[in-house]
Swiss-Prot record:
Residues 162-187, 202-217 have a biased composition (Polar residues). The lineage of its organism: Eukaryota, Fungi, Dikarya, Ascomycota, Pezizomycotina. Residues 229-288 form the SH3 domain. Keywords: Cell membrane, Membrane, SH3 domain, Stress response, Transmembrane, Transmembrane helix. The keyword Transmembrane helix applies. This is High osmolarity signaling protein sho1. Belongs to the SHO1 family.
């Protein structure tokens, strides 16, 4: 199971707001139910609504904290739909009672039902839905909000990359395994042409110092030009661990912002905020 991180909730306004409101609504319903029960006349069935709603809120907090909504979205919608029915029945019983405490409990259930409806609409929609892209653009990085609807057109030379809410990272191969399968057009930052070019041996590195077999007679290594400009910005939609056998690759975490020098090919030359440079798989990134 994915690791729970409080930053996933605190850094996502939608998760933070909806979870906070649901907790507040549940507390109103719970405390009012206790008061009503002390004076008698509280429907026994509504206690099940209180318990079930508590489980739903805890479950949603775990989903937001572990960022696994795309994995369990079908189960989430099912459980929330059942919770909506249960709370609605309790609302119909409590709001018409003469007791002020019962009406307060009904108000808490109404607020909770509103949050559940929003959750169902969010998790029950397809990943490419416009409202999901708008809501997700505010998560963690404010840069994403500006890119919504105004981002640069993305290259489709190798097909569409996976949606940002895909449950599984795309199948990837190491940069060495892709020799001969990448674009044959020149790419800035690649010595001797694009990766896989016939004019370059598979053992020649794409970045950094050349191998000893390519040294001139005087023993001084050739200078490999590095990109000086990174005009593009990209956001990581998955975490990626660099292949230890390829020193040119860089690791990055989900939602991390990278600067990119060129967006052609399956591997992009990127620079992290720390200044570390290297290549990153293009279908793990989305342009801002």
């Amino acid at each position: 199971m994915a690791r729970f991180r409080a930053s996933n909730i605190l850094g996502d306004p939608f998760a933070l707001a909806s979870t906070s409101i649901s907790i507040l609504a549940w507390l109103i319903a719970f405390i009012s139910s206790i008061v009503t029960g002390v004076h008698g006349g509280y429907p026994t069935y509504s206690w099940w609504a209180v318990a079930y709603s508590f489980c739903c809120i805890v479950g949603m907090a775990l989903v937001f904290g572990t960022d696994t909504g795309a994995v369990y979205n079908i189960a989430i919608v099912g459980y929330l739909s059942a919770g909506l029915v249960i709370t609605t029945i309790s609302i119909n019983t409590l709001v018409y009672a003469n007791s002020a405490a019962s009406q307060a409990a009904g108000a808490g259930f109404i607020l909770l039902a509103m949050v559940i409806i929003i959750w169902i609409f969010y998790f029950g929609s397809s990943p490419q839905a416009s409202h999901r892209g708008f809501i997700d653009s505010f998560a963690l990085q404010k840069e994403g909000a500006g890119s919504y609807g105004n981002g640069r057109p993305m290259s489709t030379a190798f097909g569409n990359r996976p949606e940002t809410t895909s449950s599984q990272p795309p199948q990837m191969y190491t940069s060495a395994q892709l020799n001969g399968f990448e674009t044959s057009s020149p790419v800035s930052g690649y010595p001797g042409g694009a990766p896989g070019s016939e004019h370059r041996s598979s053992s020649q590195p794409r970045f950094g110092n050349p191998s000893a077999t390519n040294l001139p007679n005087n023993g001084a290594p050739d200078e490999v030009p590095q990109p000086t400009e990174y005009p593009y910005r990209a956001k990581a939609i998955y975490s990626y661990e660099a292949n230890p056998e390829d020193a040119n690759e860089i690791s990055f975490t989900k939602h991390e912002i990278l600067e990119v020098s060129d967006v052609s090919g399956r591997w992009w030359q990127a620079r992290k905020a720390t200044g570390e440079t290297g290549i990153a798989p293009s279908n793990y990134l989305i342009l801002l």
